[in-house]
Amino acid sequence: MILPYYITIPLLSAFLISLIAGKKDKWAILLSTTAGASMLILSIYSLIAQNGETFIYKMGFWSLPVGIVLVQDGLACLMLVLVSLISFTSLIYSVQYIRHMDRNWKYYALFMLLVTGMNGVIITGDLFNLFVFMEIALLSAFALVAYGGQAEEYEAAFKYAVMGALSSTLVLIGIAILYSATSTLTMAKM
């Protein structure tokens, strides 16, 4: 089952970029574009091979209320292709765009965390992990907005952080209301 690779490939590449590529930006570019290309190939393969089926993958060996459930249906396949295509083309474009900045490996590590969060939001099967992946994407996007280090970017990042905190609070309240009404966080049981 290839479903967990949508999360592990960009997460592992973000870790490796932070660990290995901290001194050389070329390694960060190579690792991130390789991860982006592999995600694009994997998502296109999933879209072709899916045949209208729904795949469910339980991460770990825990039962459903505790374990992480990943779900891939036709809409998730299409969304994964779109996220992979846009993120890969953004990575290719950003090589030239951020070339003048220092420590570009941080940009690529944050970008891979953003992809991890977006992919997790698409394929998660429960509301708690949806919130966790949404927060991963939100925090990495916040850091990417402030990445350039200029006053306008910090102002935009602050505004984004305020809106993100408000939206996260509202989502968490909504999840609490749904949990109190249904006694489950699994989306398929609601």
Where are these regions (language model features)?
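Membrane-interfacial loop-to-helix junctions in multi-pass inner-membrane proteins
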Residues: 23-37, 99-113, 128-131, 149-170
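Juxtamembrane membrane-interface segments at transmembrane alpha-helix termini
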Residues: 41-50, 118, 142-152, 172
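Short helix-capping/hinge motifs at transmembrane helix termini and TM-loop junctions
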Residues: 21-22, 49-51, 125, 148-150, ...
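Hydrophobic alpha-helical membrane segments of integral membrane proteins
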Residues: 5-9, 31, 78-79, 119-141, ...
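Hydrophobic alpha-helical transmembrane segments
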Residues: 17-22, 117-123
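Juxtamembrane/interfacial segments at transmembrane-helix boundaries in multi-pass membrane proteins
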Residues: 49-67, 170-190
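Transmembrane helix-loop-helix hairpins at membrane boundaries of multipass inner-membrane proteins
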Residues: 1-5, 14-109
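Hydrophobic residues within membrane-embedded alpha-helical segments of Major Facilitator Superfamily
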Residues: 13-16, 31, 38, 79, ...
